[in-house]
């Protein structure tokens, strides 16, 4: 077997039984008798396996490197999930008064472990109040018309949600959102999972140094979910955003802009945790996969880091 594979490289393992398994390179035994892959699926119709799978030289016919297009990102969202999220984005609830619908929305949001918070409407930071606030669960999007409800919206439940430890808020670049909420609406945003920060950490772990620029929400949706760049509208018309009644076009854009944030956060969180999971897998295999003599030797070195560990936790 070739030993010039890089971590994450897409490979196909062809077995002597004529089965084909496709996955990403994880590691190889020093004597090249075993290759390990993750994100493995059986070709052509198998589902992806979450764990690390091992293939031995005695069962392998050949290992094939697959070329991936540099233009097309690896799609990490199924067509079914994509269509499901689009349906959710079209069934948003627009709220412009503190009534039964408002309180039902607040109750629904409070029952969640995570909610998404859109930065749309806070583009000017502390220079002006937010015309709207968009929050969502993983199944329902709510557009609150702050321009109409004013401070009543925050006093009636939104402030408590945004300032509370729970639910945790998912945002992409919360800087201006936090600034606007604090200086214009007396709301101190707390307990945030920021997907832009997550992307920076992943990039630093992969490239050692931080990038010069941050990625927009659209860029992250393309990088992590494989979505088209024009899936969302990142440049909402400021004038139209303050006109009332709020146009259907603006409301549709607001809903679509937040719709994929939950799934994006899951993918980014999973990728941030990847070195940890690989490190644990290394520990699981370290002694177990050794012969008796080697296992005895390793048991006497438990105060040392396994030789394979550093390679295992690299992206």
From Swiss-Prot:
Keywords: Cytoplasm, Meiosis, RNA-binding, RNA-mediated gene silencing
Gene coding for it: EXD1
Quaternary assembly: Homodimer. Component of the PET complex, at least composed of EXD1, SIWI, TDRD12 and piRNAs.
Name the record gives this protein: piRNA biogenesis protein EXD1
Domain 3'-5' exonuclease: 141-228
Description of its domains: The 3'-5' exonuclease domain lacks the conserved Asp-Glu-Asp-Asp (DEDD) residues that coordinates divalent ions essential for exonuclease activity.
Entry keyword annotation includes Cytoplasm: yes
One GO term of the biological process aspect: regulatory ncRNA-mediated gene silencing
Coiled coil: none
GO CC annotation: P granule; PET complex
Function: RNA-binding component of the PET complex, a multiprotein complex required for the processing of piRNAs during spermatogenesis. The piRNA metabolic process mediates the repression of transposable elements during meiosis by forming complexes composed of piRNAs and Piwi proteins and governs the methylation and subsequent repression of transposable elements, preventing their mobilization, which is essential for the germline integrity. The PET complex is required during the secondary piRNAs metabolic process for the PIWIL2 slicing-triggered loading of PIWIL4 piRNAs.
Family: Belongs to the EXD1 family.
GO MF assignments: protein homodimerization activity; RNA binding
Keyword RNA-binding: yes
